[in-house]
Regions:
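Positively charged, small/polar-rich N-terminal and surface patches that mediate targeting and assembly
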Residues: 1-105
């Protein structure tokens, strides 16, 4: 396990129409990389969202990233008030990242 790096995982679910704003916020906080999965569904405060529903154009978007502890602090400072205004969900957890030739942070 010595080739693993301790990091934080951030997982965010937001409405697709807010994705661009979210990405700008993450980049301003120093994020070097992220993954986006579009048209995700589930059950939340707004009821059930089915990504296969033809009437549901945009849907929700899932964004995940791994970063160091100091980056989490900067991301949370910008993200917390943003989520209160626009809604969404953010989970932060400890994780281990396999060491690779190019770690973006």
């Amino acid at each position: 396990m010595s080739s693993n790096l301790s990091t934080k995982r951030i997982e965010i679910v937001v409405e697709a129409e807010k994705l661009e704003e979210l990405i700008c916020l993450l980049i301003e906080a120093g994020t070097k990389g992220y993954t986006v999965i579009k048209k995700v569904g589930g059950l939340g405060l707004r009821g059930t969202r089915n990504p296969d529903d033809a009437l549901w154009d945009e849907g929700n978007t899932f964004v995940t990233l791994a970063c160091k502890e100091d980056q989490v602090v900067r991301i949370v400072q910008g993200l917390s008030p943003w989520l209160k205004k626009f809604g969404g969900m953010c989970l932060i957890s400890d994780c281990e990242r396999l060491e690779s030739p190019a770690v973006p942070y």
